[in-house]
Amino acid sequence: QLGDPNAMVVATNDDAGPAARIVLLKGYDPRGFVFYTNRLSAKGRQIAAHPRVALVFPWHDMQRQVRVRGIAVPVTDQESDDYFAVRPRGSQLGAAASDQSQPIRDRGEFDARVRDLEARFDGRDIERPDHWGGYRVLPYEIEFWQGRRNRMHDRYLFTSRDGASAALDDGDAWSTVRLQP
């Protein structure tokens, strides 16, 4: 059984070096892979400065992994609004209350912010904060890895033929090679 199949590592970069964290894949289409976050967070600032990112889907229970390299671009405001509207209310409150990645005195200060927002939006929809939205990772490289006995793994690397991002459903845009374990 696969625990969180949509859990993925997003690796970004800044002047201090690489940074990685787990986020949830919230959608994909022929253009790429979508996740949502606070765009003022460390990852949001890193993406704004260096939009080339890596994703890893670590499916340990199946001895499989998918690795993606691509360019992160903001999704439209409409896509962000639509997704925010279907999030659980508690998640909406948390997104609106959090200055993600910024220091805070203690948990009580954050909890007070959430309570204030609950009171302010009592009986009303919570508006999506301007700083909260999605990114679509436009892939230019995807590797599929399958673990095998004695570390004789199977690996296939798909690379866009022109080196730029390519549509996932355009087979002619991708070249494929088998890699040694």
Task: Set out the residue ranges of the language-model regions.
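Binding-site signature for planar aromatic cofactors or substrates
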Residues: 1-181
